[in-house]
Amino acid sequence: MKSIPDNSIDMVLCDLPYGTINCSWDSKIPLEPLWEQWLRVLSPQSSVLLFGSEPFSTRLRMSNLSQFKYDWIWHKNSPTGFVHAKNKPLKDFEVISVFSPYPMGHASLLGDRRMRYNPQGLEVYGKMSKSSKSKFGNIDGKRKSHKAEVVSDFTNYPRMVLSFGKDTGKNNLHPTQKPVALCEYLIKTYTDNGMTVLDNCMGSGSTGVACLNTGRKFIGIEKDEQYFEVAKERIESVQKDLEMQKHEQQEEQEQTQNDYDEQEVEFTDETIDAIGEIDAMFDQHDDVD
């Protein structure tokens, strides 16, 4: 990460090794050096989102408690822990901890110092005037002015529990792989189109795929050579598919335009003669007048 320029990353989305399984890919990573690099590369208004599970999630929060904001809960469609089912409840969730050096608050007060947050899935439920005495609750976190201007108000704000099924079959390429759809949701929540996302433990490349699907740039780091190749091949395959889809859409648009052009009226000799006769009739009418 030392080669990444300062202030060039708009979001870190990372699934660090939890250090709870006795295998090579789940070895603990020192957090202090990571925070030093993450905070160096973050651009204004950016966030760091880290997947975790207890007791590792507590370790994550305590590693930077002053910049910890809140947790999302990822509710899985299938539980784990059947080996210990007679001793404790099955587990069907993981935690996503959100950190940022920038405060949460109203954009009119904080400006570019405000942590970026784009709530997903909002629904318009009514209109209200900006001259209303109520100054809070609008989507962009800005205080309402007193101008007589009608704006939309919204409902269906996100709750902290996110339900996403795990990727299965040929799409499941890593033991701790996170769903692409979940990564897309988080990326859209904390970045805008064209921004850059960093995953310094990218595994099979789900974050990279999600970035391609949402129009973001991606930087991925993976120390395991085998999984690096898996991620590289997967991301390149998705990129190729997206380029092909874009090409097909362009061809469809061109064909639609061609079909429209072909439907334009063609003036045959008979049509021109008929128009000439009509013009002659009008000329005769003018002479009579």
Show where each model-derived region lies:
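A short acidic, amphipathic alpha-helical/loop segment
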Residues: 37, 59-60
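Short, well-ordered alpha-helical microsegments
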Residues: 1, 56-59
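Mobile active-site "lid"/loop adjacent to the S-adenosyl-L-methionine
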Residues: 16-33, 162
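A short glycine-rich, Lys/Arg-flanked "PGG" loop and its adjoining helix->strand segment in the class I
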Residues: 29-44
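Short "lid" loop at the C-terminus of a central beta-strand within the Rossmann-like core
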Residues: 18-19, 54-57, 75-77
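Short glycine-dipeptide loop
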Residues: 42-48, 193-194
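Class I S-adenosyl-L-methionine
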Residues: 2-6, 10-13, 22, 62-285
